Each structure stands twice: as C-alpha cells, then as structure tokens.
C-alpha cells in the first residue's frame, strides 16, 4: 500500500485561543521505493506532515495509511511499536538525542529495545556505523566527545540500525560541511537504490535536483504540487512561479538553451554539462 494521506487536518492546540491549523484537508500519496523531496516555505506544514508517518502526531481529522497500518483521528494506531521500527524518522539536528555512554551502545539501543539480543543488536549497530562511514576506532568513545559531523553520523546510524522500510529525513544535512553533505545524501540515495523509501524535507534545491526522484511542494498546509524532479526542474519556470531559486545547473542549462545549445534534460551535474557543451563546440569547429 502506498503512503497516503486522506483528508488529513492537524490542528495544534485545538479548542484553545492559540489553535493553529498546520495541515488542512491534505490529500497526498507518496510513491513507494522512490526518494521524494518535501519542500515549501517555513510554516507550510512539512515537519507536521512527516511526524504523522510514524504517529508521533495523530490527525485531528482524516486518515494516514503507512505500509499496512491505518492512523486515524481519535484513535491510537495498532502496532505502534512496530510502525516506529519500520518508519525511521531523523529530525533536524538528531545529534541532540544521543544519550548512551558509548557510540556502540547508543546505536544498538534501538534494536535491543525491539527485542534483538545483545549480539544481534551489536551486529546491527556495527553495520549501520559502517554504512555512515564512522571510524571503528571511535566505537567506544562517548558520543558527547565527538565533533558535530560525527554526532550526526551516529544519530543517523541509530535509525538505520532498525532496518527501516521508510526513512524520513527532516533537513538531514543542516550544519554539515560540503563533504559531509555529499556523503550523507549519497548514503540516502544508496539506501533508496536497494529498496528503502526515502522522504526528505529540504530547502536545498541542489540536493533535490541531484538526488531525488519526485518533489512535493507544500503551502498553507496543503500539497500544492507533486511531480517528478525532471519535470519540476525542466526549465526553471515552475521554480520561478513558486518563488524558488532553481539550482545553479538548471539556470546554466536555461542560459545555454537560450544561446542555441541542445542540452539534455537528464543532465544533473557540471561534468556532464561540460561534456555536452564540448561535443557541440567541437562539432561546429
């Protein structure tokens, strides 16, 4: 079953003078097996949306379907513990959630909490730490002694150790340096290639363009647009209509097309664009 929101409304502080509607009659389906970006202005409902996927928030009205679970307004969903194992949610700055004495204990905590033996939990933790490129020499180090980037890797490994079927990422590269950003996004893309559905909240259009398959645009608690990345960035016009600055490479492609170059819509990096231009220049020499 796809991930589906049916007429979902979420109101913070319902019935109080401070009531605020974050999601308004939301109708939206996510494609399983894809890497989908969720974008929109601050306050558009992005973070509220993703917290419904593992029932951290429940709908005020409507129904959310995730895998084989049904999350309804007014009722506690069945199989809540297993749902939170299947849907891994990585918050912005997840490193603030680290608490164990050592890195290995922290990452193995989740699997043990879900019934894995000590040996199984350690094996899952080590596999997850290897996935995020964490130095084995630091496994017995206190998480509090690590750098910011190292803490981020440990926190994400803690989610991956649960073997989630769906990985939900809320600004996962915030605060990382360029190299760390590329490494993390490449990891998420690899996980997606082997079958994990990945949903990523992002404001970085360069990341969306390079790594994602689909784009969901949120505005005023509703889905304003859901389309493929290829269509969304085809010529920059959709971005401009939404007040979004297109990625630099999309702007370059548009400029080159205006000069008469034939640029393939599938080109997503500077190297491929340079090769395309070089071939056309050489052809006309």
Annotate each predicted stretch with a short phrase.
Residues 54:
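Helix-to-loop junction immediately C-terminal to a conserved catalytic motif
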Residues 62-73:
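Conserved ABC transporter NBD signature motif
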Residues 119-137:
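Conserved ABC ATPase "signature" region
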Residues 142-146, 150:
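Conserved ABC ATPase signature
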Residues 159-160:
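ABC ATPase C-loop
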Residues 167-170:
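Catalytic Walker B motif of ABC-type/P-loop ATPase nucleotide-binding domains
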Residues 208-210:
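A short, surface-exposed alpha-helical micro-motif characterized by mixed small hydrophobic
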Residues 220-221:
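Conserved ABC ATPase "signature" C-loop
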